[in-house]
Amino acid sequence: MRKKIIITTIAIISLTAAIAAKNHTPAANTNSIACTADMQKSIAGKILRFHVLANSDSEADQNVKKQVRDAVGAYIEPYLLECENIEETRATVNDHMDEIIAVSKETLAANGFTYGASAELTHTDFPEKTYGDYTFPEGNYEALEITLGDGAGHNWWCVLYPNLCFLDTTN
């Protein structure tokens, strides 16, 4: 059932993008920009992203960012399997926010890091990103955002709902 819901959600997002692209010609640059903005807003209302900001760009901070990503993903994924829409996903993330923060801090401490971690549901800007066959335009999206230390390093992101998070964990 969950797989059907994810496939249906992705199909709706793809169809929205295809219709928006067809209804605007690239020759009319203003219309093309408006089309992209409309498409992004439509998609943004249907997905919840996951964003982890590293403390810095040092190799150690970048490595622990990935470990936090994996630990939080392993913790929250079983709860998200029951979610059938973005509202349920958002509620589940909120219900488990204290544990998400605790898992993040425990992962940092287990790897010898003394800086902290915070997490929140927020709206933030994302660049264009492709997950498998699906490309999401740059723009502002709702996200579970985890900040490690100063949050000044390169970050990692994915789509939490529908769950596309671990299709590409190399970037």
Residue ranges and their predicted role:
Residues 25-49:
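N-terminal, intrinsically disordered, polar/charged segments of Gram-positive cell-envelope systems
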Residues 46-97:
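Early exported N-terminus immediately downstream of N-terminal targeting peptides
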Residues 86-154, 159:
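Mid-length scaffold segments of soluble, non-membrane domains
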Residues 1-4:
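Positively charged n-region of N-terminal signal peptides that target proteins for export
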Residues 32, 157-171:
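Flexible, solvent-exposed short loops/turns enriched in glycine
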Residues 6-20:
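Hydrophobic membrane-insertion alpha-helices, especially the h-region
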Residues 59-61, 128, 155, 167:
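Intrinsically disordered, low-complexity acidic/polar segments
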Residues 53-55, 149, 161:
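Solvent-exposed residues in well-ordered beta-strands and their adjoining turns
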